[in-house]
């Protein structure tokens, strides 16, 4: 008896119908990392609850939208090396495991900074400043231990953070006072010794202002002339609604790219709340003073301001996309508005692409659309 073809026909028809249905389904919403996949990495700074998968609102956004990650605090000296002779890698290990599990380009932040560094680093047992030799030894031990632990896993390090004054001169930090200006060279040398393949960055804010930018340019030229392995400049990107202008941002990126280093936007957010004082910096101390006032949008961000924020992000990303050959990464400093450091005791801010409920804002669409403009 001839076998019936009916079941086979229905099976094939069902398969083809399924294929047709799948092909006809509209694509899902475009993500940030997909929109810029041919241009640069899209990163985000995350906190402990997020890399421990405890933030039910933020974690899905991180995994869907971003392909690079930076830790907010857990790799700063006071957290990872709180006492002489004692390191604590509990949280950094989890951070790196989170990044690897989600196939992210992992950044280490930060090795040498004057803030969030314990006093013992700079003092002897009597509370007096240590010698240059002792501080260099402590710096080297710290960098070799931390960077060496994650060799080949953390791909890029913010080696030195915020070493310049607003006029471009060297900031008089304990590092500079005890070691001298060459503490920066030493830090980069030690980081390269610990992981010769890692990208090494100098990171700072307000580099769009010409005096400070010129100081950073001189610093990078000096490092490169001495054969110091600096890979990239990190423009923090803590911007205002009216500063820097697109022209300033364009000129700044071009100036650093001309030096032969990669450019990173490392801590991007847009402060939309009017400040109580004229402050164009990301200095923690100054912003702590300003944070107690200027609560202009305590009941939510009005629609006109949402649209203004979207326009601001769009003009920034047009500049970034223009320089996509020189920019390696754009990292947002926080996931949702509620995560932002720009919120204060009496100051509610809205500087990011996702609101406090984890919903995309008009600014999100503006960033996506900026890359699609012809």
Where is each model-derived feature located?
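Structural preference for beta-strand elements that scaffold enzyme active sites
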Residues: 39-43, 67-70, 105-107, 154-158, ...
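Substrate-binding cleft and catalytic face of glycoside hydrolase catalytic domains
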Residues: 64, 68-82, 91-207, 274-275
């Amino acid at each position: 008896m001839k076998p019936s073809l009916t079941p086979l026909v229905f099976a094939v028809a069902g398969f083809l119908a399924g294929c047709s249905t799948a092909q006809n389904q509209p694509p899902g919403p475009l993500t940030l990392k997909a929109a810029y996949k041919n241009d640069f990495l899209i990163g985000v700074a995350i906190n402990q609850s997020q890399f421990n998968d405890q933030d039910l609102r933020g974690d899905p956004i991180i995994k869907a939208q971003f392909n690079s990650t930076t830790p907010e605090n857990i790799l700063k000296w006071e957290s990872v090396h709180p006492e002489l002779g004692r390191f604590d890698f509990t949280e950094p290990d989890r951070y790196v495991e989170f990044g690897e599990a989600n196939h992210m380009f992992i950044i280490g932040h930060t090795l040498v900074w004057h803030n969030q560094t314990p006093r013992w680093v700079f003092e002897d047992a009597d509370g007096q400043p240590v010698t240059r030799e002792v501080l260099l030894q402590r710096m080297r031990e710290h960098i070799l231990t931390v960077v060496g632990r994650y060799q080949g896993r953390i791909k890029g390090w913010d080696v030195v953070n915020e070493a310049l004054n607003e006029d471009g001169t060297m900031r008089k930090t304990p590092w500079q006072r005890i070691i001298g200006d060459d503490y920066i060279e030493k830090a980069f040398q030690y980081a390269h010794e610990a992981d010769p393949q890692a990208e090494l960055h100098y990171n700072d804010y307000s580099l769009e202002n010409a005096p400070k930018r010129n100081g950073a340019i001189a610093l990078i030229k000096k490092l490169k002339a001495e054969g110091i392995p600096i890979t990239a400049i990190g423009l923090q990107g803590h911007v205002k609604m009216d500063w820097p202008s697109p022209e300033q941002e364009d000129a700044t990126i071009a100036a650093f790219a001309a030096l032969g280093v990669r450019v990173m936007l490392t801590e991007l957010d847009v402060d939309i709340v009017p400040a109580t004082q004229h402050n164009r910096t990301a200095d923690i101390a100054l912003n702590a003073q300003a944070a107690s006032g200027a609560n202009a949008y305590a009941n939510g961000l009005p629609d006109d301001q949402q649209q203004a924020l979207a326009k601001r992000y769009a003009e920034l990303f047009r500049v970034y996309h223009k320089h996509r050959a020189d920019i390696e990464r754009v990292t947002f400093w926080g996931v949702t508005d509620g995560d932002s450091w720009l919120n204060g005791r009496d100051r509610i801010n809205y500087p990011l692409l996702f609101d406090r409920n984890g919903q995309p804002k008009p600014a999100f669409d503006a960033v996506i659309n900026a890359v699609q403009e012809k």
